[in-house]
Amino acid sequence: MLAESYPWFDPAHVTVLPFGAAEADFAAARSHRPAAPLIDFDDGCQHFVYAGRGGAVMAFALRALFRAFQLYLENNPADARRMRFHFIGTDYAPPPLGRECALPLARELGIEKFVTEQCERVPYFDALHYLQRADAVLAIGSDDPGYSASKIYPCILARRPLLLVYHEKSPVLDFARRVSAGTAFSFADARDHEELARRILAGWFGNPMRRLQEGHDETAFRPFTAAALTTRLAEVFEQAAAVARTSSHR
């Protein structure tokens, strides 16, 4: 795009770097405690946590997740009644203007007592605390195939069991497979949530071992850490400086 607008612009000299995953933040978050905790992790329940923006674009994936839980509740009530779903910081609007995206869908299915939603944003280290303490982390995607959530890094670095529900063409799924993170369920279009729900039911709720599976391929993930990408950025600056020095001597 820039090359089309500026004839002097050379795309060959462009390097695109993603944001790095800040492992040091998680080390610091281990000793952090929210001033007003939203979740009681010691109440004997299983707490599944989603932290980040929500919205109508996530309705299909959320509806499938909640439908899967509804079916599990019908067939395995003793286990399902101990499960809690928490959605934190789902809207950018300041209080009291936040708009719920998860609770309305839960109400449609009659499972709202198992779901909490905090629309307002929370401090960064509070969010990391909730992810680290969760029995499982939820990574719920948009029905937009091009959607790539930057929050996938914290979801992985929490090193907790991870459930991903994304469009099959989302870059997030490719990345999760590359680093062997989580249990993923994909969909091709946002029409048949019932079929997706039954896959989530069988592969996640009905598979306790999957719900205990945590971690990822540390070696495959290393190039995406803040330390590795800072090194890469320094290399880019060195290359740019070398080009400038060469040009100045011509």
Give the location of each predicted region:
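Conserved donor-binding/catalytic core segment of Leloir-type glycosyltransferases
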Residues: 39-59, 66, 229
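Nucleotide-activated donor-binding/catalytic signature segment of Leloir-type glycosyltransferases, i.e.
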Residues: 82, 87-91, 96-121
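Nucleotide-sugar donor-binding and catalytic loop/hinge architecture
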Residues: 28-47, 75-78, 208
